[in-house]
């Protein structure tokens, strides 16, 4: 297989990934592959571009490093071109409502007829099967959070609240990435492809497991947070200092002992309620939980963030200032690791955004192009799989493909 023009880099160089999906969840999976060196083809509708394009800045991050193909993959010759593309594809990711592809004739079996080794990842809100009431419903971030039990655990004691920005989309996209790579490993070993059914609500069910386990195995449901503090453990969560907010985790035997000395509670150490060797202070079950919070609040309010960070570093207590977005760029850790970078968009503008993560030492990722325009690479991709100029123009004239003007 001849690859499309692009630099060779990263741990996934030589891999061809194709995705069909809009907005965040499915495309985020494609984005991760592209940043790690895979050749990633982004399929868009011919008549309507991906709705993410209406956003002024985010698409330049979420669609960088991609090749843009505008093709009607469900109709006539457009479908034929798509299936021919699948013959040279390693991983195909589609994000839609339930078994939408199967309903329109593109089943796993049809795809495997063209490429027996193909890894197929289906990403939807409620899965490829189940009840009619749910399977075919549309879903976005908040829907998956609400249906999974994740949303009800977040927010404040007075009201549940979704976790933003778009947590379910990113978790689901990353799940698609890791699952597809696991399936690819097996497919290369056996010569047999795989189909992966990723339901966004099940991803969030898994991510929300920590507190749910107490309900499933004892009928006890954890309360929601109060003003950003951990619902279970004292000394954990969001706290206010004299000049702003920090988060902290009071975890560990020596950490608790030394912190209690600072806040005036050393006399409680070694009591039946806080025996020697205590590693966590339970906010509810420990009768001194409210007192610990009261004393800690008072101590923190009397000190600046810098003073707290310095003291907690001495005590090995994990804490961090709650940074504002403008503070990120000048933070020395961000600067040292180049966590924020910039590149040129396709129209020559400078775009500043988060850098590639994680950082591979021997085969690092790379940003080699900005977001392509609608249909920008259609002709190049179709030529790559054997189509002539006349073939491409015929697809365009029938409204089955769009090429860049």
UniProtKB/Swiss-Prot annotation:
GO terms for biological process: carnitine metabolic process. One of its GO terms (cellular component) is cytoplasm. Keywords: Cytoplasm, Transferase. InterPro entries: CoA-transferase_III, CoA-Trfase_CaiB, CoA-Trfase_fam_III, CoA-Trfase_III_dom3_sf, CoA-Trfase_III_dom_1_sf. It holds the Pfam family CoA_transf_3. It catalyses: crotonobetainyl-CoA + (R)-carnitine = crotonobetaine + (R)-carnitinyl-CoA; 4-(trimethylamino)butanoyl-CoA + (R)-carnitine = (R)-carnitinyl-CoA + 4-(trimethylamino)butanoate. The keyword Transferase applies. Its main location: cytoplasm. The active site is at 169 (nucleophile). CoA binds at residues 97, 104. One of its GO terms (molecular function) is L-carnitine CoA-transferase activity. NCBIfam families: PRK03525.1. This is L-carnitine CoA-transferase. It comes from Shigella dysenteriae serotype 1 (strain Sd197). The gene is caiB.
């Amino acid at each position: 297989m001849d690859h499309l023009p692009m630099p060779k880099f990263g741990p996934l160089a030589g891999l061809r990934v194709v995705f069909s999906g809009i907005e965040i969840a499915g495309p985020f999976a494609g984005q991760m592959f592209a940043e790690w060196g895979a050749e990633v083809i982004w399929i868009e509708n011919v008549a309507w571009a991906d709705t993410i394009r209406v956003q002024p800045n985010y698409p330049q991050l979420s669609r960088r490093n991609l090749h843009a193909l505008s093709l009607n993959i469900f109709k006539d010759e457009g479908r034929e071109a798509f299936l021919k593309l699948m013959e040279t594809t390693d991983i195909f990711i589609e994000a839609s409502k339930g078994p939408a592809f199967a309903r329109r004739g593109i089943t796993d079996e049809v795809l495997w007829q063209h490429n027996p080794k193909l890894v197929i990842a289906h990403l939807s809100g409620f899965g490829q099967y189940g009840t009619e009431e749910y399977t075919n419903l549309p879903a976005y971030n908040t829907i998956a959070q609400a249906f999974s039990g994740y949303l009800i655990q977040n927010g404040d004691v007075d009201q549940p609240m979704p976790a933003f920005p778009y947590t379910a989309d990113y978790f689901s996209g990353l799940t698609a990435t890791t699952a597809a790579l696991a399936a690819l490993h097996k497919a290369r070993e056996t010569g047999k492809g795989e189909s992966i059914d990723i339901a966004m609500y099940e991803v969030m069910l898994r991510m929300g497991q920590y507190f749910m386990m107490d309900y499933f195995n004892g009928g006890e449901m954890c309360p929601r947070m109060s003003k950003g503090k951990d619902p279970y453990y004292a000394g954990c969560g969001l706290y206010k200092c004299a000049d702003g907010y920090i988060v902290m985790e009071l975890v560990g035997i020596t950490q608790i002992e030394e912190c209690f000395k600072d806040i005036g509670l050393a006399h409680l150490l070694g009591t039946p309620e806080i025996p020697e060797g205590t590693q966590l202070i339970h906010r509810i079950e420990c009768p001194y939980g409210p007192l610990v919070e009261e004393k800690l609040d008072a101590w923190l309010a009397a000190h600046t963030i810098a003073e707290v960070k310095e003291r907690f570093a001495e005590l090995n207590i994990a804490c961090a200032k709650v940074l504002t977005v403008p503070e990120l760029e000048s933070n020395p850790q961000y600067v040292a690791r180049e966590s924020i970078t910039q590149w040129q968009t396709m129209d020559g503008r400078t775009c500043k955004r988060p850098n590639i993560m994680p950082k591979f030492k021997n085969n690092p990722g790379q940003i080699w192009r900005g977001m392509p325009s609608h249909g920008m690479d259609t002709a190049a991709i179709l030529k790559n799989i054997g189509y002539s100029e006349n073939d491409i123009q015929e697809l365009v004239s029938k409204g089955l493909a769009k090429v860049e003007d």
